Swiss-Prot record:
This is Calpain-9. Residues 1-24 are annotated as: Disordered. Residues 522-690 are annotated as: Domain IV. It comes from Rattus norvegicus. The keyword Hydrolase applies. Belongs to the peptidase C2 family. GO terms for cellular component: cytoplasm. Residues 338-521 are annotated as: Domain III.
Amino acid sequence: MPYLHRSLRPQPQPVPRDARTVHSSGHSFEQLRQSCLQSGTLFEDADFPASNSSLFYSERPQVPFVWKRPGEIVENPEFILGGATRTDICQGELGDCWLLAAIASLTLNQKALARVVPQDQGFGSGYAGIFHFQFWQHSEWLDVVIDDRLPTFRDRLVFLHSADHNEFWSALLEKAYAKLNGSYEALKGGSAIEAMEDFTGGVAENFQIREAPEDFYEILEKALRRGSLLGCSIDTLNASESEARTPLGLIKGHAYTVTGLDQVNFHGQRIKLIRVRNPWGQVEWNGPWSDSSPEWRSMSLEEQKRLGHTALDDGEFWMAFEDFKTHFDKVEICNLTPDALEDNTLHKWEVTIHQGSWVRGSTAGGCRNFLDTFWTNPQIKLSLTERDEGQEGCTFLAALMQKDRRRLKRFGANMLTIGYAIYQCPDKDGHLNRDFFRYHASLARSKTFINLREVSGRFQLPPGDYILIPSTFEPHQEADFCLRIFSEKKAVTQDLDENIDIDLPELPKPTPQEEETEEERQFRALFRRIAGEDMEVSAEELEYVLNAVLQKKTALKFKRLSLLSCRNIISLMDTSGNGKMEFEEFRVFWDKLRYWMDLFLQFDVDKSGTMSSYELRTALKAAGFQLGSHLLQLIVLRYADENLQLDFDDYLNCLVRLENASRVFQCLSVKNKDFIHLNINEFINLTMNI
């Protein structure tokens, strides 16, 4: 039987108890409500105040808005009136049609709706001016608490509102979502699939209608039957076309909701229909099968009633599926499970989640087009061990989401262009270097790199080990990300970030004076001339000695070593604790310095006297310091310049402090354990000396 959504009055659902409350007080919704009831006050949310800061970040309201509680707007406010339905969603003076389309779709799935809109609240008994809504964010559910003060102008809600003026669940839901993202202005412009995922924790799937499979109608039918949320839109060629109205009443660049599918007999033919809703609550399709079109006159009243046909200008309309494919460009589906819509069976999916970051200078390597930095991206090992039932391969879905970009819009952040590539894993552990990607092609990749919040793809590969590389398209772009891997059989994933491993050589014994080289004899003469008979130099004197020697190294381009570097060198080599360096200590350090210079010259590929911060991981590893990404990020922040380059002085300073810290730890660790115990005095003493 064809599937058609119908409005059902929701049954009260228990409030989910695994959502984390988001409020600066640390108290739950119920604790805050009870506190207000006991004190006889109405809740005021200091985290999202009734002020312009909650409205806009780049402008001021053109007219003065007045924040009012529902009881100050109407005499008998209701939270939900006659069930939460798609007709409760009418767009206001905010360009968030994408959000409204998602909310309209949410009302078609009563179970999902009851999770997002808990029904333990209202304006009757227990009212305290406080409400809460739940949203999925990057692998967890958040319980967002708000007060019920809403922006109005002349006693009318300015933004989202219900067609029934005394119903407020949709307006309060919009406010909670605005709080989650920092302001109402942050909700301007977007994709319906973004909010759909936040309402369900589901998986996005996008279809370009002109490239859709032949059974596209059946795919949509199955999606609705499974409770998926569906949106659709018409592309624009330029900004001037945004929200332009076509002759047939459709709006370009505007988010619509798919609310139903059905088939009817019409003049001896079976016609496939699709029902679509405009969140404006008005402006509809005026072609065949529109509200007042002649096609309906040949349908019985019973059939019209079954299809829910009305001639009201409520924004919802039917159209022939063939017309839909002609006039719309894109369909977005948020599946509540990763099951393929082409598949008739449901599976139990295993899921693993990775939270990571692209950090400029260390892990923001860009796509494979940028070979010199691509290898520095986060690398995730995926082990597929079991074939799917009756299949030769292992099916999995990879969904890469960039985090918090909407909330960061006020700081100039936009959606980055993201994607991923999948490689066969070699028979070795550890972070793969540039040469691997130079000589190996990817086995699979995301369909495209695109500036959407999430990019997802479905793959089937033979059992084995693979490396998944999530990245932005361009290098040096920063963002946090969440990668979800869904697999039919249990898959093992591992972040290939390297563990800290320090390999320090034994300090060499002093060379007898009679065995010194000519260079060492020259050092001794220079050292004696600067230090005097005690043969000890201060940091200032060491600065003079090293710069005098290094300036003769024509292959090494640098201005000079800083006094800070020389102080750190003495801290590393000073065994007597007098703040000076003896000649034998200098000789030991000189051997070390020559090796470090050779490494620097090796990684100064353009002979500019600087090293790229992206090469630092390999350079430090060659020097005996295998470090994880987080520590590398801290080092880059401290030592790299604004162009992500390190000169020799920065490079040397970094190595000296790393070795000093490592040797101090070795001395203090008991039986070579991976931890030490320090009191506050010992800790400060150590940090001041490293």
